[in-house]
Amino acid sequence: MPNSTPQSQLIRVHVFVTGRVQGVGFRYSTVDTASQLGLTGWVRNLPDGRVEAVFEGARDIVEEMVRWCHAGPPAAVVQDVAVEYEEPEGLRGFEVKRLVN
């Protein structure tokens, strides 16, 4: 449960996934997987073909989600996952955000 982890043990990662990751269901698979794991955050496509996402939750669960990003859904071909650690903001829910222009 996302609310069962003390705030001090929560982490936030900002990831950028490179490869064939648009048009293959990456965003919606990310929402499903992150929601099943009890993470909060968001995911969106970028104009340069990458997928950007933010995950907040317990360290071990967030790290599991980052590992999932290295493979993605079956049709994806992931070349790289860049990970930046940030301060948690206390996000609620998990959503697909609109494309950045």
Curated annotation (Swiss-Prot):
Acylphosphatase-like domain residues: 12-98
Disulfide bond residue pairs: none
One GO MF term: acylphosphatase activity
EC numbers, comma separated: 3.6.1.7
Superkingdom as given in the UniProt entry: Bacteria
Keywords linked to the UniProt accession: Hydrolase
Family matches, as PROSITE patterns: ACYLPHOSPHATASE_1, ACYLPHOSPHATASE_2, ACYLPHOSPHATASE_3
Catalytic activity field: an acyl phosphate + H2O = a carboxylate + phosphate + H(+)
Pfam family name, one: Acylphosphatase
Keyword flag Nucleotide-binding: no
InterPro entries according to UniProt: Acylphosphatase, Acylphosphatase-like_dom, Acylphosphatase-like_dom_sf, Acylphosphatase_CS
Residues at the active site: 27, 45
Family: Belongs to the acylphosphatase family.
Name the record gives this protein: Acylphosphatase
